[in-house]
Amino acid sequence: EVTAAATDVKAGSLRHDPFAMLPFCGYNMADYWGHWIEMQKKVGDKFPKVYQVNWFRKDEDGNFMWPGYGDNARVLDWIVRRAAGEVEAIDGVTGRYPKFEDFNLDGLDIDEAVWAKLFAIDPDAWAAEMDDTEEYFSQFGDKLPAAITEQLAKFRERIAAAKA
């Protein structure tokens, strides 16, 4: 769905709008990112954790794989326990994933096979996403923080390993 802040974008397409701040940010986004990278160095392990979810992943029949609504609280439960150091995570291509046994799936029709599909990735799609992201970042030139370039390179390595 396209929101008022994103009226120049077609529904279903990705808009490069970091933190949904483009209409409101009064300075170069590369400087903005650099600020947050420096803040993380100063604050260390007290810096807020960032998690990404895709509530709308569909199976091969076009059905949503995650039930959504109130069951989204299960994801928040895992995030809180992860941030508190109560559960571990598995390193994956796009980040760190919950372990099946650490996630509250009581009452849901999600077995280990469905769980694996929830976290499966398409390396070719992610490689194309990296191409698009790097093209977007190219507009920032030398202002783009090196930490971002380094993370993109590491991400490309993980994608290549997933393809192998």
Question: How does the language model describe each region?
Answer:
Residues 1-164:
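Conserved NTP phosphate-binding and transfer environment spanning the P-loop NTPase/kinase superfamily
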